[in-house]
UniProtKB/Swiss-Prot annotation:
Function: Exhibits a very high intrinsic GTPase hydrolysis rate. Involved in the addition of a carboxymethylaminomethyl (cmnm) group at the wobble position (U34) of certain tRNAs, forming tRNA-cmnm(5)s(2)U34.
Similarity remark: Belongs to the TRAFAC class TrmE-Era-EngA-EngB-Septin-like GTPase superfamily. TrmE GTPase family.
Domain spans labelled TrmE-type G: 212-370
Keyword Magnesium in record: yes
Organism: Caulobacter vibrioides (strain NA1000 / CB15N)
UniProt gene name: mnmE
Name of this chain's protein: tRNA modification GTPase MnmE
Biological classification of the source: Bacteria, Pseudomonadati, Pseudomonadota, Alphaproteobacteria, Caulobacterales
PANTHER family: TRNA MODIFICATION GTPASE GTPBP3 (PTHR42714), TRNA MODIFICATION GTPASE GTPBP3, MITOCHONDRIAL (PTHR42714:SF2)
Record-listed K(+) binding positions: 222, 241, 243, 246
Cofactor binding, per record: Binds 1 potassium ion per subunit.
Length: 446
């Protein structure tokens, strides 16, 4: 028999209300032991919870009968006062009555096992809980609603249709079938291959929405990188002094720009140094910048002629920030800006020593991030697991396209394998260890 499980579904600690969730075959029995007469299903009712004759709390009780519950099982929710003592007393009573504390993600795993949602939707639930920005909320909510799953299912259906044509050509070679029956599968497979390519190209966008768009502030020591970071963060996140080389490590600050999560990093000033610690900071700065989605080369406007020498690591798409332009040589700044704009860099003039400077940079970055991450209405794949299976399906599909007309049996097998790769995203045929990894990332009460 399946265990009856329980957990605190709201955040631990002092609060006005705490929600304790119970799910499993003995949910109603255990709830009745605590509150006596059970409320009707899906009707919230106030009950006094008692255990061993001792009152625990006055609670709002909700009961759900299977399959009309989150988990697909009989379930009960207790909405109690959020004091630690009240919650601990209720959890202890549930344990004594025969329920056990749920494992991480166990409620959602039961929902998956009972067909209430598929694996991609379950991952969307985890992302929705972790969402910090409006973009992350929209992305995760679309995934929970089944937008990704519906797309994958449509692709699988197209593969099944193509497979039927290919297998007809294999299984009935002597029947009066049109000679081109196998070739009829080719246009649909080509279209699907193009859609898979587009989805894989969009994976990086989805992952940046979920994990954050990475922006690196790089440049020579004392260019004003730390001052700009503090201005963007609107707090003293980095130490600012007149001493060159103050920043020795990468300082990451999470921000929300234009509704998207952004990680801005202040890095050690790039220069040759005999100082072992500073040299390690420079190495880390270069590594972080190499992996960044956008790199801002900050140049001290007071020494703007330094920007005449092209840094070796600079690349098209980088930004050149002419900082401290309120004290810079205007003619020299204009010359440098014109030169670097011609090299494919975006050039911004920032008065980093005033309040307007960081604000102007923040607005420019918000616009850039929104342009980079805004996409189609459906959510993009955000997880490496999805990208791997999509890439696998594309490989099988490309091989099938090369086999159609030559080795129909091989083409049919490749189409079958492509369909199975898509099925693994939704969890239809995933092994137990994959399921365990997915649900282990959840909180206990979900």
């Amino acid at each position: 028999m399946t265990d009856t499980i329980f957990a605190l579904a709201t955040a631990a600690g002092r609060s006005a209300v705490a929600v304790v969730r119970v799910s499993g075959p003995r949910s109603s029995e255990i709830a009745a032991a605590l509150c006596g007469r059970l409320p009707s299903p899906r009707l919230a009712s106030v009950r006094t919870l008692k255990h061993n004759g001792v009152a625990l709390d006055a609670a709002l009780v909700l009961r759900f009968e299977k399959p009309a519950s989150y988990t697909g099982e009989d379930s009960v929710e207790f909405h109690v006062h959020g004091g630690r003592a009240v919650v601990e007393a209720l959890l202890a009573a549930l344990s004594e009555l025969g329920a056990r504390l749920a494992e991480a993600g166990e409620f959602t795993r039961r929902a998956f096992e009972n067909g209430k949602l598929d694996l991609a939707q379950a991952e969307g639930v985890a992302d929705l809980i972790d969402a910090e920005t409006e973009a992350q909320r929209r992305q995760a909510l679309g995934q929970v609603g089944g937008a990704l799953s519906q797309r994958y299912d449509r692709w699988r259906d197209l593969l099944v249709q193509a497979l039927a044509m290919l297998e007809a050509a294999v299984d009935f070679p002597d029947e009066d079938l049109p000679e081109e029956v196998a070739e009829r599968a080719r246009p649909g497979l080509r279209q699907l291959s193009a859609e898979l390519n587009a989805a894989l190209a969009d994976v990086s966008r989805g992952r940046r929405v979920r994990d954050g768009f990475r922006i690196a502030l790089i440049g020579a020591p004392n260019a004003g990188k730390s001052t700009l970071l503090n201005g963007l963060a609107e707090r003293d996140a980095a130490i600012v002094t007149d001493v060159a080389g103050t920043t020795r490590d990468v300082i990451e600050v999470p921000l929300v720009l234009g509704g998207y999560k952004v990680l801005v990093a202040d890095t050690a000033g790039i220069r040759e140094t005999a100082d072992v610690i500073e040299a390690e900071g420079v190495r880390r700065a270069k590594a972080w910048a190499e992996a960044a989605d956008l790199r801002l080369w900050v140049v001290d406007g007071f020494h703007v002629k330094q920007a005449d020498a092209r840094p070796e690591a600079i690349r098209v798409g980088d930004w050149l920030i002419l900082n401290k332009t309120d004290i810079a040589d205007a003619d020299a700044s204009a010359h440098v800006a014109e030169r670097w704009a011609g090299e494919g860099l975006t050039v911004l003039h920032i008065a980093g020593t005033s309040a307007e400077g960081p604000e102007a940079l923040r607005a420019a970055l918000a616009s850039h991030v929104a342009d980079a991450l805004s996409g189609a209405e459906f959510p993009a794949a955000t997880r490496l697991r999805h990208a791997e299976r999509l890439s696998e399906a594309r490989s099988y599909l490309e091989r099938a396209l090369s086999d159609v007309g030559l080795e129909v049996e091989l083409a049919a097998e490749d189409v079958r394998l492509a369909a199975r790769a898509l099925e693994r995203i939704s969890g239809r045929i995933d092994p137990e260890d994959v399921l365990g990894r997915v649900f282990s990332t959840f909180c206990i009460g979900k």
